[in-house]
A protein has these predicted regions:
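Predominantly soluble domains enriched in secretory-pathway, periplasmic, or organellar proteins
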Residues: 12-312
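Bacterial N-terminal signal peptides
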Residues: 3-12
């Protein structure tokens, strides 16, 4: 029976066979690489400095990891599974995002109320952009023209023109926004508001909040798939699901303890969730809205950012 169940699980994960998860483990100071086809860890990469944020480039060549305690960003050659660079950024690097073309890497400096801009080829900081207090999550629009920064202690989101590196607008949202996610069209953004236990919906073009969705306790980040939003509720050990069109709740899914990072696979069929206190990565079927697998990773997984990599 177990063998049959395993075969069924692997078959259901077939659509994710060309992806891997790069999970930052803050307490074990490393990065776990999980093969989504086999649901098994395939590599552990030492990082140091209490790694938290992670962003994999669109071409899958590099994974960029923030280490708040080291005040640095580590550059990982994703296919080779090895560290190939380290960029000192100062302050408290947390959230991170890569431009769609891979040329620039954006890093939220929690302490300096700024976003550092790294030239990916030169591996050095080339600019700094002032934003609100305690910037956390970052996201870039699919066309690469705009960068959004969730500024936790200002209860706002900064919208930045990536060409001029100037502020385009500031959007007031719920209390203490942390993770921010932009949809595939680049039209709407979603912030997980830790203080008000809700998600703000932002119209990117007009730079205004157009909706609010109540979720569970201490929402951390948001993923989007199949017309639904998926939100990690840290204090509840659940993922809240809501309809993107109606903004109405759909379901709450129990995952591991203290879920944090969350992302959808490229085909939108699976949702991956990093569970901080369980030291696991949960796999959710985005259509059936149920957990279909769990993988042990390192100690204190956060996976804050775009942590999935397409391998083909």
């Amino acid at each position: 029976v177990r063998a049959i169940a395993l075969v069924a699980l692997l078959a259901s994960l077939g659509a994710a066979r060309a992806e891997e998860a790069f999970v930052t483990n803050q307490l074990s100071d490393d990065l776990t690489v999980v093969d989504l086809a086999t649901s098994k860890p395939v590599a552990t990469i030492a990082i140091g400095g209490k790694p938290a944020g992670v962003a994999v480039s669109n071409d899958g060549r590099f994974a960029y990891v923030t280490s708040p305690d080291a005040k640095a960003v580590t550059v990982v050659d994703a296919p080779a599974r090895k560290v190939v660079g380290r960029v000192d950024v100062g302050g408290g690097p947390l959230g991170i995002a890569v431009a769609p073309d891979g040329a620039m890497v954006y890093v939220a400096d929690w302490y300096a109320a700024a976003v550092r801009v790294i030239d990916a080829r030169e591996q050095r900081v080339v600019a700094s952009i002032a934003v609100g207090a305690s910037p956390s999550g970052l996201a870039v629009t699919p066309d690469g023209l705009l960068l959004l920064s969730a500024d936790r202690d200002d209860d706002s989101v900064s919208i930045i023109d990536t060409a001029s590196r100037e502020l385009r607008g500031i959007v007031k949202v719920g209390s203490r926004p942390f993770g921010v996610t932009i949809d595939a069209d680049g039209k709407r953004a979603y912030t997980a508001n830790v203080g008000t236990n809700d998600v703000s919906v932002i119209d990117v073009a007009t730079a205004r909040e157009i909706g609010r969705v109540h979720v569970g306790l201490r929402p951390y980040a948001v993923a989007l798939a199949q017309g639904r939003g998926f939100v990690t509720d840290q204090y509840d050990g659940k993922v809240s699901v809501f309809d993107l069109a109606t903004l109405q709740p759909v379901k709450r899914i129990t995952v591991g303890d203290y879920p944090e990072g969350i992302e959808a696979t490229a085909d939108g069929k699976r949702i991956l969730v990093a569970n901080w206190e369980s030291n696991t990565l949960s796999m959710i079927d985005a259509a059936e809205l149920k957990v279909i697998g769990e993988v042990k990773v390192g100690d204190g997984p956060r996976a804050f950012g775009a942590f999935l990599r397409r391998t083909e």
